[in-house]
Amino acid sequence: MNNQDLINDKSKNGLTYAKAGVNIDMGNAMVEKIKPFIRATKRAGTDAEIGGFGGLFDLKAAGFTDPILVAANDGVGTKLKIAIEVGIHDTIGIDLVAMCVNDLLVQGAEPLFFLDYFATGKLDPEQGAAIVSGIAKGCQQAGAALIGGETAEMPDMYAKGDYDLAGFAVGAAERSALLPSKDLTEGDIILGLSSSGIHSNGFSLVRRIIQQSDLKWNDHAPFNPQMNLGTALLTPTRIYVKSLLPIIKSYKGIKALAHITGGGFLENIPRVLPSSLCAEINLSAIHVPSIFSWIAKQGKIEKIEMLRTFNCGVGMIIIVAQHEVEKVTQELKMQGETVTLLGKLTKRQNKGITFKGALHL
């Protein structure tokens, strides 16, 4: 039997993979749609072409001499549910990339490449292409190449229209430039970089508040009447790589970073500190965006719970030696970041973080 015979040998009554719910042709159609997005992420070290069994990256071509590889993977939690219900799919991929590459940045690493996992019950090529376009935008913002991924069509695993996303990022740092630095000391200054909003944590709580308030996704956002609620909540997570990475490389006084994600201030800042030091944060210095004030008021959420769940307007923490604070602050502002002096490192007594002042919600 030759190839043509195989193609023509179709039993009208026989089962096929497509009849079982997996349409390979739809998957191939989606691949063709996303190729231009992926090519746009090309960078030194890779051609950002897909189709092979694995993606390749040349560390030497990327300019590293003694690199340490750094890996991170993450998802976007139940922010996905809002994207699905609102029908906006071209920004959630930015969140996916942000959650991974911002974690790489905390180690002092430059994001090199990214891979995604997209799973759904029934593949919609248009929806899938929109999602990947967002992932590609995030990769461009981070300077990372999108070198591969997996699209899984799994009948009966997901409700109609639902999907899930996961991302995996790899970066590199020169061995001598890894963060956090070992010379963190009392008196080092804590700076905060503003977030773009909720980012990608705490959405199960946000969704519960919205359910109790009877608001609809197309209603005006109570905290931002110029936008509808769904669009406002889907504001993408800020990616700090291009503004912060050159400064990390230029100033040895930058000793540590902390990405304020799940666990908020309470969990994430102590993670980068030695057991002898404590972060003293002045809550009065934080400019809390109206979205968090609305969440706290609507849900009757205590301030400590807000600080443990949300970024409260601060998406990235930087710990800097006193003598370089002014220069680092100026550089960050020139890169378009909003910088706040939040506190300093002190000798640890019991906890890895203490607060003074009041959080103005």
Swiss-Prot record:
What GO molecular function annotations does the UniProt record carry, in alphabetical order? ATP binding; phosphoribosylamine-glycine ligase activity; phosphoribosylformylglycinamidine cyclo-ligase activity
Q: Which domain of life is it from?
A: Bacteria
Q: What gene name is given for the protein in this entry?
A: purM
Q: Name one GO cellular component term.
A: cytosol
Say which species the protein is native to.
Bartonella henselae (strain ATCC 49882 / DSM 28221 / CCUG 30454 / Houston 1)
Under what name is this protein listed? Phosphoribosylformylglycinamidine cyclo-ligase
List localization entries. Cytoplasm
Q: Give the E.C. number(s).
A: 6.3.3.1
NCBIfam families reported in the protein's UniProt record: purM
Please tell me which top-level EC class this enzyme sits in.
ligase
